[in-house]
Regions:
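Domain-level signature for soluble enzymes in the chorismate/prephenate branch of the shikimate pathway
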Residues: 1-386
Length: 386
């Protein structure tokens, strides 16, 4: 058979090489775990920027001898380095907080296949051996599951680079007793998903969660005759299209999610903003400690006075202590017209001396303040070779 079809023979060779690459990547990750254990004993920082840069430069030099492009080598190994860093961070956090890595029940929005489900699966893969799924219809249900002990963790989207803040989640954070214990960022690639053979001219109804509709509004404006139907999650939309088995309906969602429902990709959609990412946060009943060997982020919720310059005064406290704020979001205080709460993400460990001084000063000048959580930052900024 292979002698009659040389393409098949070549593909078999490529598949065999791919299997070897997977085995080597798994072996490399095991070594990264051992490196993490060594850093735990020697109390060294997880990230070693100089080592990462030297590694990339060496690999680029070696790659030239094999006619491999420097950009290709850099992109490939930046991803491998990121995996190594996050694997070591998870190891240090498990050790510090005595987390049982065996299993966890994680609540997320929607049935299987939603972006929240994919994010929960990604988080679980790095932190637990077994992931017990708990899909929910609404954000409030997710919070309730963890608050009442029905689930161990909640994974919820908090912001998107195209459509902005997820306001429903910010509003729930005002009143919850849960703490943020982790974060992750997911690349969002929307597709128009269908249950069988059809084309764009045949579609008349599209189902999805409001967020994908916002993020893909430029594409959707090309088809003004399409009826837009909102669902509680992208996976609920996919489920509806799979059950309908109609050439006239489609869902906006992920290709990975569509596969779970037997749907095909009719069109890959470019979102309004080309780089479309959603940041998710992980919530638990108990706050965690973050190792000083790991880059940390602290999220605060505060209400300032209504006098002029009150917010500026609070932000100056951060500047005076050399604390970097990476996000500021405001939300109305329900029941108090024209008053707002502010959410701040600060690039610092809650236990650091400067952060503690800043919290003391903020407590004196704000009407109220609450630490929503301190957690490892999973934003691994890639190192570029010189």
């Amino acid at each position: 058979m292979t002698s009659e079809n040389p393409l098949l023979a070549l593909r078999e060779k490529i598949s065999a090489l791919d299997e070897k690459l997977l085995a080597l990547l798994a072996e490399r990750r095991e070594l990264a775990v051992e490196v993490g254990k060594a850093k735990l004993l020697s109390h060294r920082q997880v990230r070693d920027i100089d080592r990462e840069r030297d590694l990339l430069e060496r690999l680029i030099t070696l790659g030239k001898a094999h006619h491999l492009d420097a950009h290709y080598i850099t992109r490939l190994f930046q991803l491998i380095i990121e995996d190594s860093v996050l694997t070591q961070q998870a190891l240090l956090q498990q050790h510090l907080n005595k987390i049982n890595p065996h299993s966890a029940r994680i609540a997320f929005l929607g049935p299987k296949g939603s972006y929240s489900h994919l994010a929960a699966r990604q988080y679980a893969a790095r932190h637990f051996e077994q992931f017990i799924e708990s899909g929910c219809a609404k954000f409030a249900d997710i919070f309730n599951q963890v608050e009442t002990g029905q689930a161990d963790y909640a994974v919820v989207p908090i912001e998107n680079t195209s459509s902005g803040a997820i306001n429903d989640v910010y509003d729930l954070l005002q009143h919850t007793c849960l703490s943020i214990v982790g974060e992750m960022t997911l690349t969002i690639d929307h597709c128009l998903l269908v249950s069988g053979t059809t084309d764009l001219s045949t579609i008349n109804t599209v189902y999805s969660h409001p967020q994908p509709f916002q993020q893909c509004s430029k594409f959707l404006n090309r088809y003004p005759h399409w009826k837009i139907e909102y669902t509680e999650s992208t996976s609920a939309a996919m489920e509806k299209v799979a059950q309908a088995k109609s050439p006239h309906v489609a869902a906006l969602g992920s290709e990975a999610g569509g596969t779970l429902y037997g749907l095909q990709v009719l069109e890959r959609i470019e979102a309004n903003q080309r780089q479309n990412f959603t940041r998710f946060v992980v919530l638990a009943r108990k706050a965690i400690n973050v190792s000083d060997q790991v880059p940390a982020k602290t999220t605060l919720l505060m209400a300032t006075g209504q006098q002029a310059g009150a917010l500026v005064e609070a932000l100056l406290v951060l500047r005076n202590h050399n604390l970097i704020m990476t996000r500021l979001e405001s939300r109305p205080i329900h029941g108090n017209p024209w008053e707002e709460m502010f959410y701040l993400d600060i690039q610092a460990n809650l236990e650091s001396a400067e952060m503690q001084k800043a919290l003391k000063e903020l407590g004196e000048i704000t009407r109220s303040m609450k630490v929503l959580g301190c957690y490892p930052s999973e934003n691994v900024v890639p190192v570029d070779p010189t």
